[in-house]
Amino acid sequence: MSTSFKEIRVSMATTEDIRRWSYGVVKKPETINYRTLKPEKDGLFGEQIFGPTRDWECGCGKYKRSRYRGVVCERCGVEVTQSSVRRERMGHIELAAPVTHIWYFKGVPSRLGYLLDIAPKDLDKVIYFAAYMVVSLDEEGRKEDLQDLENELRLDIKQLRDACDASIASAVSELERTITELQDAKTSASRINKVRSEAENKMANIRREYDDKIEHLERVWDSFKALKVGGLYAEDDVFRDVQDRYGDYFDACMGAEAIKRRLEDFDLQKTAQELGVQIVECRGQRKVRAIKRLRVVNSFITSKANPACMVLDVIPVIPPELRPMVQLDAGRFAASDLNDLYRRVINRNNRLKRLLDLGAPRIIVNNEKRMLQEAVDALFDNGRRGRPVSGTNNRTLKSLSDMLKGKSGRFRQNLLGKRVDYSGRSVIVVGPTLQLHQCGLPKLMALELFKPFIVKRLLDLALAPNIRSARRMIERGDPAVWDMLDAVIKARPVLLNRAPTLHRLGIQAFEPQLVEGKAIQLHPLVCAAFNADFDGDQMAVHLPLSLEAQAEARVLMLASNNILNPSDGRPVTLPSHDMIIGLYHLTTVKPSAKGAGRAFSSVAEAIMAKDRGDLSISAPVKILFSNIVLDGKTLDSAVVETTLGRAIFNEALPDGHPYINELVDKQVISSIINNLAEVYSKVEVANTLDKIKSVGFHWATRSGVTVAISDVVSPPEKQEIISKYEAQARGVQQDFEIGLLTDLERRQALVSIWSEATDRVAEAMRKCFPDDNTINTMVTSGARGNWLQVRNIAGMRGLVANPKGETIPRPIISSYREGLSVTEYFISTHGARKGLVDTALKTADSGYLTRRLVDVAQDVVVRERDCGFTRGVRMPVTFRGDDGELHKVENAEHSVYGRTLAEDVKTPDDNLIAKAGEDISGIMIDSFIAAGVESVEVRSVLTCRSKVGVCSACYGRSLATGARVDIGDAVGIVAAQSIGEPGTQLTMRTFHSGGSASAVDITQGLPRVQELFEARTPRAAAPIAEADGTVSIEDGDRARRLILKSDNNEEFSYTVLKRAQLRVKDGSRVSLGDQLVEGSLDPKEVLRVKGIRAVQEYLVNGVQQVYRSQGVPIHNKHIEVIVRQMLRKVTVVDHGDTSMLPGELIDQSRYQELNREAQAEGRKTASARQEVTGITKASLATESWLSAASFQETTRVLTQAVISGRRDPLIGLKENVIIGNLIPAGTGLSVYRDVEPEPRPEAISRMYPTRRPEIENLLEGDSVDPEFDFSSLTQGLELPDDYPVQ
């Protein structure tokens, strides 16, 4: 799809818009006729509305074939067209009563509630027919007639009182007559008293009845006087009488109709002005609410949307192919949930129409309207209000909102990730004979992948007459097909991908080599990059089709071009396992080996002696070398005391490399390849790696490494060591029992004793392992395992933790070699199981962290060479040790390396070492240390002033290539991957200080990284000094109070837990920003007290601390890219005379732009406060609504985008992936795409050898002859095999 638009805007659809999209009204709830299996007319699948189910055929079959294109059948009313229109054409439902869109009144915040200034619960009452709302009021008429109406009311009340008096008088005269009669009849006094009592009760009831009527009239009158537009009134006798008596002065109604009429009369401009005045005049909650309301009102004003569109008279029906019905076995059907939800709406709508036609009572009609509203709510967002509608098996039905949000929603399932053709997958096996840029592709898989190319070649060479017969040849396995496959596979790279693709090295390009079998062969050195092993892992193969894609795969993605790890710039293609065993064996020295002390005139002579059996490869000998580099000097010849094995190893290294005359283990080979990557070209490095791999495998097979139970040597003095520490432990226990120690002190003492005992046993065990022990060889060389594992097998298990995470103060004394007792086995099971559970949880948590990081940083792309801002950040290179000497800062290669200098670097005596603008290399760092430079000013993405993305100068070197980063590099994605990829290696634990669960917890590992990136306030955050001054400490029963008295007599109080470890003493002097208590700081407090640079350093160092503690190297610049995104926003404090609102969170660049505009026009500028936003919040607050909606909270983001008419400028990567554009990064940038190639004379003469003079004249001339026959140029020209012939 070619797209030419520059931005996407989303807005609110009007009733006319929906009718314009529609191809007809859906009137019936039926889907298909189950007898004929054809769609029902006017139903949810009707062909008259949505188009034919068969290509070029009307519903009844009268018109068939494409020659009737566009004809509408007069019999069945179906247009003759392609059936694919059923994916595009929409219908609509004409509602009998308006309904409210649930997104606008049930969202948080409720947009309808803010607009009309109604509480959401009151809004709910109106919409669902539980209360009336006054929608119009004739205030002038009421005011004019108020006196007359009151006189009328008083008259009614007087009449009621007169009637009351008359009724009582009548009752009195009746009573007197009755009593006279009873007295005449000489009735008893009790009987007369009873009659009198009944009569009095009757008169009281009469009076009460009339008083109630009068009171009711008073209430009716008060209600009428208090009526206001937007007022809510329950449906009771008072309001019914208000309507009966004064209905001419106002109009009140229920449901969406009431909301619609309010919205139609709503004056946005007037409301905005009133709210603006309120913001200036009010304080507290009223001001906050006014700001929130104004935000919603302004959204409607800027988008020019009609608020009445939030109430729907018409509902769109999406195309039937997007809510399909599929026939299953046994004649049953599986249908999309949307069909059930639409059916409920249509049924209720049709019933409401019938009730209205019949003139049903209002209460029945209102109930049906409420049910229609609920049906539409369920269609748009099922479960948002009340109980969700469920289908069979009590499963909640998926609504339109559910189709958009979540992992299986439209955004993430179909728009951001698509299945691709020309791909396959298979199990991987090792390919030890492959070169670094090659992979083994099974012949059958290659045949299927390259089938279209083979078909074309068969046709071009006239080996097959047509496509069908060519396909048949391939299926038969004709011998000619294999030759074609060999030809088309040449110079065509394929992409290999292993899931999970945690970083960019998870997809690399290789040149395929055809292999037998069905497994893909993988080069052993790229396993680390893919995190692959050969225990059943599978990999996917993808075929780049276009010439551009092939060029990108070859130049950018070929495995031999991806030797360095983008996270730290160190080589990732390192020999491992058996290769290291082979190299270690090859370079080992055995002084007593055969042939020791001999001298040879060349390596060849030594090899000859070895072949004759006179010399061992490990024997120390003297060999004469020519053209050798020793101690940094190149010598024509030199005799070196070495071994033949080391000489063989050095032959694998490139010319000019220093001679390696030491035992080669994992660390040595790592530093060798590190140096190779710095000094030599990629081609030479790749060739050297292949040679080292081959040498390693060759000698690993000859090393004879085996492991037997006898190789596991337990230290004989173990029992003696244990007995000594057992005695110490008993002493501690006795001290505890007599009350000299607390339980906490006892536990700490025991843990300390047994930790020391375990270390002593481990030392003794290591001494027991001879140098030629194979387990010793494996661990020492770095091929496999570590001494901790060996200690568990041969020494003792040591201390383990209980389920609470506390260390059990009694160790497991047995080793696995000796076997554990039942008790020891039982207490060690918890740790083993916890490890497996943690791994599963970590994988999910780490994946989610990576997703959030990618989302927040996805639009950080290198956009320009230099932003022009030369101020950077100062970083230490050396520090002065206790000995007074300068030492290299421990992590200089992860902080200073690869950056651009912001200023010249000079020695203490003012000699220039490096100029501003140069990139810092490893060699340059060494020169800084030698010259005594303590710190350097470097450019950083934290200070980059590029409006969009970052600039090349501020970012510095690309760690993946070792060269200055190119324009178009997606450094944000690389940063997110570099931080997220090792996430599974981090611990999940929260450590307990002092071994007590109630003590202060120190969050570490992955949760700590999340805490920092989300800028959360830590639990029991450590306070920081808000001024220079003196601290005094007050002890309370449960807590301590630290009181800081500043130098200008201000007092600050901090309450901390009693058990918190203080960093200050009573009377200590502190400076602004000093940490007062051990623990984590609140980033927001650091920003408030110390400023933006301090919070940047705190976040970067905090994340690095976690990764370094786990031995994971990451360059600071990756963390800085994320921190830059976290500090993009500011909160407006005073909006001045700008369009911003107080309290609004706004992008810094937008804030500065609006302020510049105001300044230019002489208006008052705004002021703002810097904010640190967590990565989730920063992702949702991005300029791109497409990116935010596809991340999280889809419905909320879309609702806000719709009411404000948000425009998406399509700057980031995600939004361009969603709409199918090339991403604005790498070769997708216009700077690389809008390039006109200029042919060089050599290229012309090589391409068109016979027509050179004509072409040169053509190129030199100002204009081209329109009659020139360009096709003649290709005569006699050798075209590539897959050149597309028209």
Curated annotation (Swiss-Prot):
Which branch of life, at top level?
Bacteria
* Gene Ontology MF: a single term: DNA binding
As its record notes, the protein acts as a catalyst of:
RNA(n) + a ribonucleoside 5'-triphosphate = RNA(n+1) + diphosphate
Binding residues for Zn(2+) 1, per the UniProt record? C58, C60, C73, C76
* Assembly mode: The RNAP catalytic core consists of 2 alpha, 1 beta, 1 beta' and 1 omega subunit. When a sigma factor is associated with the core the holoenzyme is formed, which can initiate transcription.
Similarity comment: Belongs to the RNA polymerase beta' chain family.
Q: Where does Mg(2+) bind?
A: D533, D535, D537
The residues listed in the UniProt record as binding Zn(2+) 2, with positions renumbered to this chain, are C867, C944, C951, C954
Name of encoding gene: rpoC
Q: What is the lineage of its organism?
A: Bacteria, Bacillati, Actinomycetota, Actinomycetes, Micrococcales
Q: What does this protein do?
A: DNA-dependent RNA polymerase catalyzes the transcription of DNA into RNA using the four ribonucleoside triphosphates as substrates.
Give the record's cofactor note, including how many are bound. Answer: Binds 1 Mg(2+) ion per subunit. Binds 2 Zn(2+) ions per subunit.
**EC?**
2.7.7.6
**Biological processes per GO annotation:** DNA-templated transcription
This chain's protein is named DNA-directed RNA polymerase subunit beta'
Any one Pfam family here would be RNA_pol_Rpb1_5
Q: What keywords does the record list, in alphabetical order?
A: DNA-directed RNA polymerase, Magnesium, Metal-binding, Nucleotidyltransferase, Transcription, Transferase, Zinc
Q: Which organism is it from?
A: Tropheryma whipplei (strain Twist)
Which cofactor does the UniProt annotation name? Mg(2+); Zn(2+)
- GO cellular component terms given for this protein: DNA-directed RNA polymerase complex
